[in-house]
């Protein structure tokens, strides 16, 4: 007898989920910046995934730090798509994992990462509120506040912890 995989998982106490974004695309008019694709047809896909047993979904938005980026347009475009995705998930009975990720590539300092992540989280939560997303019904998957991989000065773990905690406390309702 063939047992659906999701049923097997449920019997083991495992709740299945699925990544629903369709990767990143170039943000038109904004060189070196990306937006996440996948909102087209998402309602239909979520209904199908729910029927198949998925109870959570993941959507990742990437924000790059570099010369004059991220732009306000990039932050808003990604926050907007995260909020629309989260709203659609909740309407479908699926818990959204909201992942606004400020990338660690580059040479930026921990202070720059902190500044950008604070802006990003503030705008993401404004957009989630605008789309009537029940915040208690999401899982936030944020980045840590860290120095970029190629930054000549790497912050110690205490500074990473302190700035990450302060950023989350300041911006997450």
Where are these regions (language model features)?
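Glycine-rich, proline-tolerant flexible connector loops at the mouths of alpha/beta enzymes
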Residues: 1, 29-30, 61-74, 102-108, ...
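Alpha/beta catalytic barrel-like cores
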Residues: 1-52, 65, 153, 157, ...
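Short, well-ordered coil/turn segments that N-cap beta-strands
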Residues: 11-16, 52-55, 90-96, 129-138, ...
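Glycine-rich anion/phosphate-binding loops
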Residues: 31-46, 70-85, 118-119
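Hydrophobic pocket-lining residues that define ligand/cofactor binding sites across diverse proteins
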Residues: 49, 86-89, 128, 168
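Conserved, mostly hydrophobic/aromatic
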Residues: 59, 98, 140
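Active-site acidic/histidine proton-transfer and metal-coordination neighborhood
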Residues: 74-97, 101, 105, 110-115
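Active-site capping/gating regions of soluble enzymes
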Residues: 108-173
């Amino acid at each position: 007898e063939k047992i659906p995989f999701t049923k097997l998982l449920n019997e083991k106490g495992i709740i299945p989920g699925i990544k629903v974004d369709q990767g990143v695309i170039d943000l038109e008019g904004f060189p070196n910046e990306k937006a996440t694709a996948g909102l087209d047809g998402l309602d239909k896909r979520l209904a199908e995934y729910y029927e198949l047993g998925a109870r959570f979904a993941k959507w990742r938005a990437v924000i790059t730090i570099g010369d004059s980026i991220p732009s306000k347009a990039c932050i808003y475009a990604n926050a907007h798509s995260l909020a629309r995705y989260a709203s659609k998930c909740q309407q479908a009975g699926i818990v959204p994992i909201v992942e606004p990720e400020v990338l660690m590539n580059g040479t930026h300092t921990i202070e720059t990462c902190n500044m950008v992540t604070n802006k990003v989280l503030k705008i993401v939560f404004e957009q989630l509120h605008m789309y009537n997303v029940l915040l208690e019904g999401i899982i936030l998957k944020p980045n840590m506040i860290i120095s970029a991989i190629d930054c000549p000065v790497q912050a110690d773990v205490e500074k990473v912890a302190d700035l990450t905690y302060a950023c989350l406390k300041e911006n997450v309702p």
